[in-house]
Structure formats: C-alpha cells, structure tokens
C-alpha cells in the first residue's frame, strides 16, 4: 500500500494544531492562576 504523504501531513496538522492550541491555553490559565 502506497502512503499518501500529503494526506499524512494534512492529518498530522489537523491533529497537532488543536492540540498545541489547547496546551497553550492550559499553560496560560495555569500561570495566571498561580
């Protein structure tokens, strides 16, 4: 089976961008509360 590189990159970005956004929000709330 041939791996579609563009599909893999699109999936990786689709997962990583919201995850990074949530981590940034979490860090901001943790630093502001403490």
Curated annotation (Swiss-Prot):
Location (main, coarse): plastid
GO biological processes: photosynthesis, light reaction
UniProt keyword terms in alphabetical order: Chloroplast, Membrane, Photosynthesis, Photosystem II, Plastid, Reaction center, Thylakoid, Transmembrane, Transmembrane helix
Localization terms from the record: Plastid, Chloroplast thylakoid membrane
UniProt membrane topology term: Single-pass membrane protein
Transmembrane segments: 5-25
The keyword Transmembrane helix appears for this protein: yes
Gene Ontology CC, one term: chloroplast thylakoid membrane
InterPro entries named among the record's database cross-references: PSII_PsbM, PSII_PsbM_sf
Highest taxon listed in the record's lineage: Eukaryota
Function field: One of the components of the core complex of photosystem II (PSII). PSII is a light-driven water:plastoquinone oxidoreductase that uses light energy to abstract electrons from H(2)O, generating O(2) and a proton gradient subsequently used for ATP formation. It consists of a core antenna complex that captures photons, and an electron transfer chain that converts photonic excitation into a charge separation. This subunit is found at the monomer-monomer interface.
Subunit text: PSII is composed of 1 copy each of membrane proteins PsbA, PsbB, PsbC, PsbD, PsbE, PsbF, PsbH, PsbI, PsbJ, PsbK, PsbL, PsbM, PsbT, PsbX, PsbY, PsbZ, Psb30/Ycf12, at least 3 peripheral proteins of the oxygen-evolving complex and a large number of cofactors. It forms dimeric complexes.
Family to which the UniProt record says this protein belongs: Belongs to the PsbM family.
Protein name: Photosystem II reaction center protein M
Gene from which the chain derives: psbM
